[in-house]
Amino acid sequence: MLGGNDPHLLHRAKAEADASVEIDPALGVGHWMCAVVALYQRDFDMSAEKFFEAEALAPNSADLLLQHADALAHFGEAEVAWEKFQQAIDLNPLAPDIYWWAGASIAFKREDYGAAVELCGRMEDDEPALRVLTASHALHGDLAAAREAGSRLQENYPGMTAREISSLSPDRDPVANEKFYQALRLAGIK
């Protein structure tokens, strides 16, 4: 989520999501947005609750399933996340780049770094996925590709350290962020 680490933007997004739920509680999108905001506020239990409410209201929304899958991976439930990602792809086989980015992130959490690289390769523009691409190349053992992607990543995050970049991911388990940090270090990011 763009601005996912900006408390002011998260506060505004939460207010709008809450208003959406108040206007029409039977519409899944408000619950969905509440879930996304809660994820980036690191309120994992609320995020999980809101994603389940949203999915109950809109069970055939491929975009919702995708975001729920991504959130499940951040919660530490990578295998369940992968199944939900597959459901989203089944509903939207001509998926846009964000699907492949989310799938790569989930594959990374499953420690399937080759699949993560392959999913990034399906993107028309891999720039949004440079964090996961860099880390996946590093942990897959292709340090030359990791350093190349890492150079591009540093252009997008000028002046940020590997620790700061890795902390952008809202993971429940600190071990996940530490693994990501170590991968970025392998790619040559300080």
Predicted regions and their residues:
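Alpha-helical protein-protein interaction modules
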Residues: 4-21, 46-51, 55, 62-190
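Short alpha-helical segment in the cytosolic histidine-kinase catalytic core
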Residues: 22, 26
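Charged DNA-binding/catalytic regions of mobile-element recombinases
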Residues: 42
